[in-house]
Amino acid sequence: ECPMCGFEFGKDDDSQLEEFSMTEVDLLDRSPFRWMDIFGTGKCVTATGFNGFSMVIDVGELSCGLVKRSGGRIRMISIGTRKQAIASADDFLREIEDSNSAKKGRRWLNERISDKQREMLSRNGVQVSGFDFSWTKYKAACYLNYLWNKGRVDDMVNNVREKHEKR
């Protein structure tokens, strides 16, 4: 009963719900960040900002959300479904980035890779041809974030894989 008006909820309502449908929300499309599939397999997506980056890596049936604040340590914030990992990784970026950086970053998303980024990628074993126009500053930044943290990322993912296989 409503304390304000006295209406009795559900008293005369014997009807059954006949049809119900849920719609899936594509978290990546709704994100203010551009999530990139850096290996082209769909198993590792990453997004970066000026203050940090996030990654979601599929490990068997699980997905892991990894994040790192600029100058900080990479850490795992989620192990679960892909949606859970993406939501937590995206929330992390939303918390550490401000709306001004999103505006500044739009231009950066589509600008050609810089010579400095091409050089850094090359030092890490990734050759980018001067004629490969698919490489932008943003794509290079995402890839470099992975390469610079590869050892720790691989350790964390392998740890999850080992624990999951023991089950």
Put a short name on every predicted segment.
Residues 1-167:
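Non-catalytic terminal extensions of ATP-dependent helicases
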